Amino acid sequence: MAGPTDTPLSAIGGIAHGGMQTIQGGTVTLYATQSNGYGGAALQLAPTTTTDTLGSFTLAPNVACPAGQYAYITIAAGDTGGASVNSNSLLMTALGKCSDLYSGTTYTGQPVWVDEVTTVAAAYALGNFTTVSGSGASAVVNISAPTNNTGTYSVTVPSAGGLAHAFMNALALVNPYSGQPYATYNNKAGYGVIPDAEIFLLGNILQSCVNSTGTTGTNTAMANDGTPCGKLFSMTTPPVSGASTPTNTMAAMLNLAHYPNPSVNTWSTDCTTAGGGTSTATSCLFGLSTSEGAYGGPLTSAPPDWALAVVWPQGYGVQTGANCSGTTCGGINYAYYVALDYQDNVYVLNTDSGTSPTYTNINGFGPDMTPVFATANDTTYILIKEIATDIAGHVLGINAATSSSGNNYLRVYSTANGSLLVSTQAPTSSPLDAVIDTYNNVLYLSSSTSGTSLRRFTYGGTSAAPTYTTATLTPQLTGGAMQLTLDANLNIYAQEASSSNTFKVDYAANTGTYAAPAYGSAFTTTSLSGNVSLSVSPVSFGIVADANGNAYTGASGGLYKVTKNAGPPVSISGGAQISLPITYGTAMYFRYLYLDGSGNVLGPDNANGSVTSGVAVYDVADGGLALGTYKGCYVSYVTGIACGTTGSTSPMSSPRGAAIDSAGDIWVVSSASHNLTLLIGAAAPTWPALSMVKYGRPQ
């Protein structure tokens, strides 16, 4: 469907649609974001108006849209030619930065299109900053962020740019003036592939409610009134303790964006009663998208979940030229790990094989995935398994060779252009992982099962000319370390390797201060048991610390909590295994864990790609509730639509690493599918650089 006109207006106007039908009598409101916390009260910019019989509207002129903030528009209630007003309909369109829309108080953009598709894009991209208040024609969409997660990135304040990033995503998915999703991210040729078929399907699902007269009775997570709106609201009630059932279309889509695996209940055949039938919430939602749906080209079968996955395919990145250090850089290939810096820039570690690599390199991208650089295809240091960023402008990795090979080197690159700044030997055997503290020091351990000492590269010099001095510290392990993490006080957790069903987690206290961390005490240890395999060659491992100083560790069977017990002396104890959300038989892997801003733990599962891969997510505050495995759909130019139905067609086949940005998006690299996947808004906003060692949402 085309937009209403391409002629610029002095005041915002446009048209509202429910599918093919225009929305009459809908309440139109123009808002701007504010810097008053997550989902804080909206700022109304102009008096409300209503849509006419053609769905058209024009708002008052002379609008003062605040500098540094973002504008959006909503349509509440109205009817699409039915017998009565639908008080459950609430749609919106994200417009963008005030300074891009207005010259002084004069609107300089085009007429706006508001419908279900623009609502889907806004809900997924902006959901972490959005709340809904009021009801019916008085319903309000509040979009706000703390000052320190609005638009300015800084390590000295510190601050992030989550709201700016979220609006960038919304405008990169769907054109606000035509209501049409783009084929590629930001409508740029060769960029990430947008799942427009899934967006159309979600639009048709919303349309079933918008183009009705609304609900007729009570709707809960367990039952509904049988209306399209009632079914939508039941199926999008979050699967967490104490969750409220939504009462309008915007709230329903916000829930689905953040909980893409909806209600775990099974439902009756008519999708009205939970608990006794065989229908899933996903199939019930799919059933709302009828053959009369206005949005052409939707998925023709239910997806495995409702995650919105944008996929950058093999070969994307800097290929040749000034920012490619060799003519064979090649872009994304066998993507092995992903890291973010404090500005939400993205770094992908590449190789060509998981078992017999012949090279490694690093590709750097901006937050919008504009290619920035690619390091040379390094054929000497081919065993870098992970990369990390510091807060001084570097991305680095340690080559995991044996000490006898002489190739276990720390390699440090500039994040500005990918130039190699430092290559210095790491005097230990097969270091797999390294963590960076807030002072840019690098802590690492050997993965050798014969034992290892904690080592540190102390940072010095400048960003352009860094130096690193290595030292051996007091804490020692009897086995090899697979993963390390720092808690908020710079205490260290390590997960040891094991080839049995028992493995160890170790803890070393920071015996100095935060400003001058020191590690003068031995590791304290706890053992965990379950369906695990943590020897050096398999791929099941991971550990993260939370805001309270406890840790969560992963293995092939699932997730374990490690609790820090108050001393003196401080000790740690391990909890029971929390199983993966889906049982894969013997093909289970869970590794490279990450903690989002709400404290949820996530990590890629199923490394071998033999079955459907994805990102497993746990709500640890809700007793370790497994929220599901997020997969999404990949609309490939070559193979068509792949919705994670088999291992070979999943958007994430053999996912090897994940990271979360300040907007709450999950970035996932997958080796077998040779790509980078962005799950829009599927986590909570997070401080993007692990080296900031900050927990919780950016505030």
Identify the residue ranges that each predicted region occupies.
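Flexible "stalk/tail and boundary" regions
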Residues: C284-Q699
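Feature for extracytoplasmic/surface-facing segments of secreted or surface-associated proteins
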Residues: M1-T327, G331-Y334, Y342
